[in-house]
Amino acid sequence: MFRFFRHYLSSSAISLFLIETGVVIFVLYYCFSYYLLPELTSGPVVSNILLLIALPAGIISVVIYSTGLYDRWHLDDFKRIANRLVACFVICLPIIIFLFKVNSLEVAAAERLKISFYLLLTASVFIGVLLARIAYLTVAKVTVSPHRVLVVGAGRLAAEIERLTAQHKSRDTEIVGYVNLNKEAAEVSHPKIVTKEGSLLALARELGAKELVIALDDRRGVPLQPFLDARMEGIKVTSYLNFWERETRRLNLRALDPSWLIYSDGFRIGTFTNAFLKRSIDIVASLALTAFMLPMIAVVAIIIRLESKGPLFYLQERVGQNGRNFKVCKFRTMRTDAEASGVPQWAAIRDPRITRVGNFLRMTRIDEIPQVINVLKGDMSFVGPRPERPFFVESLSRDIPFYGERHRVRPGITGWAQINYPYGASIEDARAKLSYDLYYIKNYSVLFDILIILATAHAILLNKGGR
């Protein structure tokens, strides 16, 4: 794992992305040069072909990323990979045909190519990607050693790390053992507890650990010298909260304390440069999306009116940045008497109040499109924590520590929590989503926003977080 523009990324996933992007470029270049070499007579041949394939290669790589093929927990799940590559094939085939047909460089060459060429080309690209992944994972299993971590602690926090690593097998990190340093009640598996018969540094060297993670339930009275010795000898020393953030890409609210938030790095989304850049992107993207989606908006408006009488749009009060209330604008997806009792209700899975058209709009998130109006007005951003209703905010703020911190930024149409956590309607669900929201606020960057937008396409395809 390493940080790139403040966001934690899997080294294995990044390596695969670079290798597989190279494979995409190579296959496209080889196929076009083989079939079109006689026609490419004007200008340098290589530069002409590279210009021809640059945009298709970029789009294919984005589609592959957007379908979740670089999810660090599923890099070697080949059944999942094969299914996603088939989806990529279906998405990319018409795009490749369209891009090459409209390319003004080689119109004559395009005319002689049959649909079979495009089928073969697209299939070759994704077969190449699959073979590259198999080859990389086979070689990496033998040649690449995972980052070895020794956990100092055997109590509740250490047990959480054990459960995490048991649930999600990572190619990047290996827990080599747990040290019960201050004789706390052991909650991790006893075979994994190693005995410290000497210095902590010597034990770390014996186990080949490159990092110590301090996961002690009570650090009072624990000597610092062993950790200082390890640090001075080049072994990384990490707190439990930092390790959890790095490995899960969310914050652990149950172990979080204000001092960690105060002293940890990040939380730069409010600086002038970041705020100005984010707002500028929001305005440009909102105008572009509105122009692009106007035909769809017209069709959706007609369908909603045909199914049920009532207003096209639904305005609802939500809590925005700094606790200011605003009216969020969405396509209406429920019956007009959805809250006839006057008591706010969370939407539930298979909610009977949702219309048939509304169910489709929610599943595809088309109902969120009118929120570009809120983005243009400055009430919302494209990416950020989802805004909640005042009734729920008041309740959740009482029950969940740090809940109010999510209102430090503008709420978003999509967000880090929405693409990582399924839709939920309970306090525990809200707590889990807050852990992702605070991670986003802490580690914001423009690149992170772009990655979230791309991953939103993946969430829509899988109906992940659909209501």
PLM ranges: what are they?
Residues 1-144, 274, 467:
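Signature of alpha-helical transmembrane segments in polytopic membrane proteins
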Residues 1-23, 27, 75, 131-294:
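N-terminal hydrophobic signal-anchor/signal peptide
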Residues 85, 89, 145-162, 311-334, ...:
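Membrane-cytosol interface motif
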Residues 184-186, 244-257, 314-356, 414-433:
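Short, glycine-rich, amphipathic interfacial segments at transmembrane boundaries or analogous
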Residues 273-337, 374, 446, 451-467:
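A hydrophobic, helix-centered structural microdomain
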Residues 347-410, 452-460:
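A short, structured surface patch at a secondary-structure boundary
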Residues 391, 398-467:
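C-terminal terminal-structure detector
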